[in-house]
Regions:
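Conserved acidic carboxylate
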Residues: 9
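Charged docking surfaces used in two-component/phosphorelay signaling
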Residues: 16-24
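Short hydrophobic/Thr-rich beta-strand motif most characteristic of the beta2 strand and flanking loop
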Residues: 26-33, 41
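Active-site beta3 strand of CheY-like receiver
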Residues: 45-51
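Receiver (REC) domain active-site loop signature in two-component systems and cognate sites
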Residues: 56
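C-terminal output helix
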Residues: 107-116
């Protein structure tokens, strides 16, 4: 059975890139368009990994990650922050919110798959 990855990303182009990349690598992808939908889909599907954009409407990725990590049923799901916020201190901010990894946009497909495989084992 292939691993399920929840992609929480408001930009359709970025979701499409990740959809193509993850499906070619043999992963199943679930999509959410904002942080609030991401929390709901995490609860519904219990994915093996969450790729979380940070800057989104409705609820940002930091808040969505905090809510996921506060839920005992979801706490163990690893979250990778995927963000264009590649400034000094942003990786630490993502870590403090509960993210288990960090990938800056734009990312190379090889870089993203390496991080996904590192986290999923």
């Amino acid at each position: 059975m292939s691993k399920k990855i929840l992609v929480v990303e408001d930009a359709e182009d970025n979701r499409r890139i990740l959809r193509d990349l993850l499906s070619m690598a043999g992963y199943d992808m679930i999509e959410a368009h904002d942080g609030a939908e991401g929390v709901a889909k995490a609860s519904e599907h219990k994915p093996d990994l969450i790729l979380m954009d940070i800057q989104m409407p409705v609820m940002d990725g930091y808040e969505a990650t905090r809510r996921i990590k506060a839920d005992p049923a979801l706490r163990a799901i690893p979250v990778i922050a995927v963000t264009s916020y590649a400034l000094s201190g942003d990786e630490e901010k993502a870590s403090l919110a509960g993210c288990d990894g960090y990938v800056a946009k734009p990312f190379s497909p090889r870089q993203m798959l390496a991080k996904v495989r590192e986290i999923l084992g």
